[in-house]
Amino acid sequence: MRGVTSAPAAARVVEIDTPQGPARAHLHLPAGTDPGGRVTVPGALVLGHGAGGGIGAPDLVAVTTAATGLGYAVVLAEQPYRVAGKKVGPRGPALDVAWTAVVEQLRAHVLVGPLVTGGRSAGARTACRTAVATGAAAVLCLAFPTQPPGRPDRPSRLPELDAVPVPVLVVQGATDPYGTPPGSPTRRVVVVPGDHALKKDVAAVAAAVTTWLPTVLPTPDAP
């Protein structure tokens, strides 16, 4: 799984209207799953991209491949600014509004079953801030940007993590300049080789996620 740099082909791509403009949801399904209509699965992940990157980030690709291999669905969601071709997104509140709208529409028209929300970096922050609004069963944070590097004057983002009332998995690079948040009774933190990009050992990223997912979602072989 090393060196993965592009997202696998989606079984279905859905454009979703949000108050911030159209977003795009790329639906990835376990083998043999009919992509038409509403998809019933034991559980699904809805993951967002980082501030300056897209859904082809190596960690997102690795998690998508691993989770669908377990029997879960994965949606890689593009924020409206990315769909519009912009490289820089709006501030957090606008991201949160769009993200919440995406998850609501996925629940209403695409996916049946419990959802884990999450993403990498800025996408992880968005998922944390909206965990209650989206009804997430759990939150997956890849490379959570705890403290801006070299900016001790800037407030820590740790309160966003602490406010999440459901189980959280944080997968963090050992040399991430944004630091590593502490664990807690409801927050598991797994440190893997690499920096903020989490591309040095994507197999370790995938392994951390596949170990955790069955603890927060029904197993695919459950009756």
Each PLM stretch: what is its role?
Residues V13-P114, T126, R157, V191:
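Serine-hydrolase catalytic machinery in alpha/beta-hydrolase-like enzymes
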Residues Q79-P80, C141-P149, G194:
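Active-site nucleophile loop of the alpha/beta-hydrolase fold
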Residues G119-A127:
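Gly/Ala-rich beta-loop-alpha elbow adjacent to hydrolase catalytic centers
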Residues T126-T130, G150:
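Hydrolases whose catalytic domains are alpha/beta-hydrolase-1, hotdog thioesterase
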Residues A163-P165, V170-Q172:
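Short beta-strand/loop motif that positions the catalytic acidic residue
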Residues G173, P177-G183:
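Conserved alpha/beta-hydrolase "acid-adjacent" motif
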Residues G194-A208:
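Catalytic histidine-centered segment of alpha/beta-hydrolase-like enzymes
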